[in-house]
Amino acid sequence: MLRRPAPALAPAVRLLLAGLLCGGGVWAARVNKHKPWLEPTYHGIVTENDNTVLLDPPLIALDKDSPLRFAESFEVTVTKEGEICGFKIHGQNVPFDAVVVDKSTGEGIIRSKEKLDCELQKDYTFTIQAYDCGKGPDGTGVKKSHKATVHIQVNDVNEYAPVFKEKSYKAAVVEGKQHSSILRVEAVDADCSPQFSQICSYEILTPDVPFTVDKDGYIKNTEKLNYGKEHQYKLTVTAYDCGKKRATEDVLVKISVKPTCSPGWQGWSSRIEYEPGTGALAVFPSIHLETCDEPVASVQATVELETSHIGKGCDRDTYSEKSLHRLCGAAAGTSELLPSPSSSFNWTVGLPTDNGHDSDQVFEFNGTQAVRIPDGVVTLDPKEPFTISVWMRHGPFGRKKETILCSSDKTDMNRHHYSLYVHGCRLVFLLRQDPSEEKKYRPAEFHWKLNQVCDEDWHHFVLNVEVPSVTLYVDGIPHEPFSVTEDYPLHPTKIETQLVVGACWQEYSGVESGNETEPATMASAGGDLHMTQFFRGNLAGLTVRSGKLADKKVIDCLYTCKEGLDLQVPEDANRGVQIQASSSQAVLTLEGDNVGELDKAMQHISYLNSRQFPTPGIRRLKITSTVKCFNEAACIEVPPVEGYVMVLQPEEPKISLSGVHHFARAASEFESAEGISLFPELRIISTITREVEPEADGSEDPTVQESLVSEEIVHDLDTCEVTVEGDELNAEQESLEVDVTRLQQKGIEASHSDLGVVFTGVETMASYEEVLHLLRYRNWHTRSLLDRKFKLICSELNGRYLSNEFKVEVNVIHTANPVEHANHMAAQPQFVHPEHRSFVDLSGHNLANPHPFAVVPSTATVVIVVCVSFLVFMIILGVFRIRAAHQRTMRDQDTGKENEMDWDDSALTITVNPMETYEDQHSSEEEEEEEEEEESEDGEEEEDITSAESESSEEEEGGPGDGQNATRQLEWDDSTLSY
């Protein structure tokens, strides 16, 4: 059955529903119930030099208060509830901001506020928060979302090109080998991303070269290289990053081809010149060990400096042995038995020496020579400790006894009191005890068996004797005797002893008594005396000191060389290198497993000579090396290296002595207790002459030459010798004296003899000046003394450098008694004439007298002084008149009157007597002699006045005699010529 359609809603019902709906919408708009919502994390990407950020997920804020999409046709869309009004970024210095694109959907974007640089910062992290528009027209009741984290990465742009780390590269390879890698070139890129910052490839741009480069920059050869074909290759290499961007600047690579490798030391010079006074000099500054790429486990290198031919094994100070002991701090009392020959020590004059002063003076004993030491030089008490020191060079000359030092009976008996001798390669010291009440065996002979006794090298031997023990030091190393023989003490006698060096003195009885050496007989009282047991070898520096033993420090000081090898390596440069040095600094041993570190240590080895004036000459150097390899079968051998250090000749100092050479003193001063000072104004200086190169280039100007410049230097002196010239000093009436206390304060010793006095000791020139100022000469019998002459010579380094001979003549002024002044005519001739001659000789010299009241001038002295004064006045007047006459002559020649000055000089006689004003005074024989000389000079003037007048300029430069002649020639009136 058909149903009836439902009736439509009534209009009233429709109105009711609309009102309900409208009422509900108004309520919803009035309430902001929900907060906006964001994703917890966002990831973004932005390209540098751009500002748009691509986010994942997109930036959208949701709000449940938002109207549904199907309700968009209703009035609720005009309200603010549910809309997103903005985003807020939290963080410091964040170069981004967030912008709302659509408020209703909550969509937004993030963008950069400035251009970003990936090289400065690759990524950024910050938080963001969304907020809605609130409720009502005024936007109150705003709600914010939670904070979401945003990570943004800055994408790189390939804006930088690769750049090589080095401007150029160098390498060297050995010919004939295929190398897996010769060297590596490396470039870097400043871009920040791995894609653009990494170098993906290298390329050799130079065509047709036997080399290739891989992606890591390693260059290798593609074929074996030939040194004869090419010595060096030059390659141009470029680089590309992974973005295919090429380096803006290519790099130059130089590969040198070396000939076939030979292991050994390279980069050294066979000759090294050493300038004295320059300190340490590196001898191998560029040396390195070539191992030819062989694997090396360790290397040992030994550097030796050969100095055995210099002095006594090396360069040492060449002062006397006594001075050296004092410099090393030894106590006083050392007696030198082999001194350099001098006036005071003359017993070594006949011995052959090395004939040179550059090094130590050594004495040669050939088996037939010996020297007897004068009595009093050595005072030795065997009961007290004493020391014997000697330098010796001895070879293997068989098994005969050879005596170095021997003290034996002078006459009657052959007893040896003490002696030091060589027997084969043994050194024996004999010491017989003095007579005593106890007659029992005591140690008498001490034996040492040493190679140093007969190896023909210089060695230093020191015997410290303190009965009953004897200690021997050889080159500073102590040695105990291997055998000691005992014997009875000597029988008491009154026989004097004789000390001999180089042999032994004993009475010849016709039988050799076991002495193998042929005797050299000498006639003497008490029987035939002779020398026996002669020494064959060289000796130097033989000294004996009684009363005290030598200290070990003194022994080491005496032996220490002044030259040697030195190695000063920085702490960070000797890692893994072991260094050993000999006590003499002549041998250095280096060992290490790192060849590079060993090379650095070898480059720091230096030669040093601390002497101010070293001995010039060659010092040979030798390097011997031992290499240990991991594979012993294929280990390389390093040949030895030989060179030399040439020590150049030092600038020789010129020692100059200056002062007053000639002076006179009153006889009373000679006879006084103080005497007179011989060198009151002595000055000692030393200079050297150097060549100074000109500033201009000599090749440009051949006239420019090197100039010599003299420079004053300071050094020590070791000897000053004052000797008397003429007769020897007579100890009964004259002497040379000096204050001993002042000498000791200066460290200088004085030894007196009939020939003078010798000052010894290593001291400064100023100290010697002061000491010589103190030297005084006394003579308490001056009645017959007119003058005395002395000579002074100073030296350095035991006579190596000598000063000039400084001579002093001192005259005695004899004063007349008052009676003699009143009656001078009665003066004895033996007083007048000698004194008169002495004062004539003193003209032009210093006649200063520090005590004027102690001398009363004689009549002759007054007359001479007046004559000399008048003579000087005449010279001055003559020079003036000569110049005036010369000017008038020139004027006459200008007017044409050249003949007006001609005259007849045959009868012209001019006589000037400078003594005529003193005719009434008492005259001496000396005045008459002077007048005769003046008259003879006048006669010569009469012969040629015109010639003298034309040579007036020469007369002005002449001596007093010439000036006097000129004065007399002009004592006339040139208008009338009448007298």
Curated annotation (Swiss-Prot):
Domain annotation Cadherin: ranges: 38-164, 165-265
Primary location recorded for the protein, binned into one broad class: membrane
A GO molecular-function descriptor: kinesin binding
Outcome of gene disruption: Mice lacking Clstn1, Clstn2 and Clstn3 display behavior disorders, characterized by hyperactivity in normal environment, hypersensitivity to stress, and show tendency to freeze in novel environments.
Cellular component aspect of the GO annotation: cell surface; endoplasmic reticulum membrane; extracellular region; glutamatergic synapse; Golgi membrane; membrane; neuron projection; nucleus
Residues annotated as signal peptide: 1-28
Tissues in which the UniProt entry reports expression: Highly expressed in the brain (at protein level), with over 90% of the neurons expressing detectable amounts. In the brain, relatively high levels in the cerebral cortex, striatum, hippocampus and thalamus. Moderate levels in the cerebellum. Low levels in the olfactory bulb, midbrain and pons (at protein level). Not detected in Purkinje cells. Expressed at low levels in the lung (at protein level). At the mRNA level, weakly detected in the kidney, lung, skeletal muscle, heart and testis. Not expressed in the sciatic nerve fiber.
Region (Disordered): 915-979
Entry-listed glycosylation sites: 346, 366, 515
Consequence the record notes for mutating residue 903 to A: Marked reduction in KLC1-binding. Marked alteration in anterograde axonal transport
Residues marked Cleavage (site): 824-825, 853-854
Residue ranges that the UniProt entry lists as topological domain Cytoplasmic: 881-979
Keywords noted in UniProt: Calcium, Cell adhesion, Cell membrane, Cell projection, Endoplasmic reticulum, Glycoprotein, Golgi apparatus, Membrane, Nucleus, Postsynaptic cell membrane, Repeat, Signal, Synapse, Transmembrane, Transmembrane helix
Record topological domains on the Extracellular side: 29-859
Keyword Manganese: no
Bilayer-spanning residue ranges: 860-880
Membrane topology type: Single-pass type I membrane protein
Gene3D superfamilies according to UniProt: 2.60.120.200, Cadherins (2.60.40.60)
Mutagenesis / variant outcome for changing residue 972 to A: Marked reduction in KLC1-binding. Marked alteration in anterograde axonal transport
PROSITE patterns given in the database record: CADHERIN_2
Family membership noted in the UniProt record: Belongs to the calsyntenin family.
Oligomeric and partner information: Directly interacts with APBA2. Forms a tripartite complex with APBA2 and APP. The CTF1 chain interacts with PSEN1. Interacts with KLC1 and APBB1.
Domain remarks in the Swiss-Prot or TrEMBL record: The cytoplasmic domain binds synaptic Ca(2+).
PANTHER family given in the database record: CALSYNTENIN, CALSYNTENIN-1
Function: Postsynaptic adhesion molecule that binds to presynaptic neurexins to mediate both excitatory and inhibitory synapse formation. Promotes synapse development by acting as a cell adhesion molecule at the postsynaptic membrane, which associates with neurexin-alpha at the presynaptic membrane. Also functions as a cargo in axonal anterograde transport by acting as a molecular adapter that promotes KLC1 association with vesicles.
Protein name (database record): Calsyntenin-1
Gene encoding the protein: Clstn1
